[in-house]
């Protein structure tokens, strides 16, 4: 399971000209599901995302996590993160989770974060989305479990 996280001052998702999810300070999470992913991996990754220290403390050091800064999550499914780009000029998605598996783990990821008290907005699974963000830093990390 892959989470590409970006520290943002704001981010939003639009589907069919309607904003369906938006946050101010927090993390935009692009979430990719691979074939071998499980609920256990999802919980481990969600915990890491929420606990990862990517926000600056009073000394400018990345030492604070999402909860410590009162931040929110915007979680967007992105199967292209599971692409194999090692050969040729066209990505292979053979390692990506099935749509049913990915939807289930995506929904469980969101529910897990919300259950931990984190304000969590979402995109729309499988939709053509326009994602806008102001990357603060820029700060971007590729987390995998």
Curated annotation (Swiss-Prot):
Write down the Pfam families for this protein, in alphabetical order: Tyr_Deacylase
Q: Where does the protein end up?
A: Cytoplasm
**UniProt GO cellular component terms:** cytoplasm
Q: What is its EC number?
A: 3.1.1.96
Gene Ontology MF term list: D-tyrosyl-tRNA(Tyr) deacylase activity; Gly-tRNA(Ala) deacylase activity; Ser(Gly)-tRNA(Ala) hydrolase activity; tRNA binding
- Identify which top EC class this enzyme belongs to: hydrolase
Q: Which UniProt keywords apply?
A: Cytoplasm, Hydrolase, RNA-binding, tRNA-binding
Q: Where does this chain carry the motif Gly-cisPro motif, important for rejection of L-amino acids?
A: 137-138
| Alphabetized InterPro entries for the sequence | Daa-tRNA_deacyls_DTD, DTD-like_sf
Role: An aminoacyl-tRNA editing enzyme that deacylates mischarged D-aminoacyl-tRNAs. Also deacylates mischarged glycyl-tRNA(Ala), protecting cells against glycine mischarging by AlaRS. Acts via tRNA-based rather than protein-based catalysis; rejects L-amino acids rather than detecting D-amino acids in the active site. By recycling D-aminoacyl-tRNA to D-amino acids and free tRNA molecules, this enzyme counteracts the toxicity associated with the formation of D-aminoacyl-tRNA entities in vivo and helps enforce protein L-homochirality.
This protein's domain notes: A Gly-cisPro motif from one monomer fits into the active site of the other monomer to allow specific chiral rejection of L-amino acids.
Could you describe the subunit structure of this protein? Homodimer.
HAMAP family the UniProt entry points to: Deacylase_Dtd
Query: What is the protein's given name?
Result: D-aminoacyl-tRNA deacylase
Q: Which organism is it from?
A: Shewanella baltica (strain OS185)
Ranked from the top, the taxonomy reads: Bacteria, Pseudomonadati, Pseudomonadota, Gammaproteobacteria, Alteromonadales
